[in-house]
C-alpha cells in the first residue's frame, strides 16, 4: 500500500500487515534517497523525503525557501543553495496558504529572477498555488490532489501556518 496514493482509514488487520512490512532489519540493505538539495555542502533535501524550514514570524523563511526553489528551477546554485534534480523530476509545486494572490505573485517573480529566468511568463516547471481563500481542510485536499496529479514532481513547498498540518487530528 502506498500511503501517498491511498490515505484512507485502515483496519486493525491491515495495520498489523503494514506494521510487519515496515520493520527494518540490520540484515537488509536499503537504498539511499538521491540528495537533491544542499547548502554549504550539507544535505538539506533528498528525493522522496520531508524537510521543514521553521522559524519565528518575519525571520525570512519565505526568502530562504525562494532561494531553494530558484536553485531547483535552475538546477544549479542560488545563494549557496545547490540543487541537483534528476532529469525526469524537474517539476516544482509551491503552495502558499497565507498570502494573497498579489503577494504570491511577487514571491513567484522573485523566485524566477533569482533563478535567472524570465519573470514575465509562466515557467513549465513551477506551479504556484495561492490557497488563502480556502478553509484549512480545503487547502489540504487541493494540495493533495496537486501533488498526486502533477507528473515529474521533484519538490513540494508548503508555505503556511503549522496548525494546518494538524487538521483532522
For each of these PLM feature ranges, what is it?
Residues 7-111:
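The Walker A/P-loop phosphate-binding site
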Residues 1-6:
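Long, basic/Gly/Ser/Thr-rich N-terminal segments
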Residues 86-166:
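Conserved inter-motif catalytic segment of the P-loop NTP-binding fold
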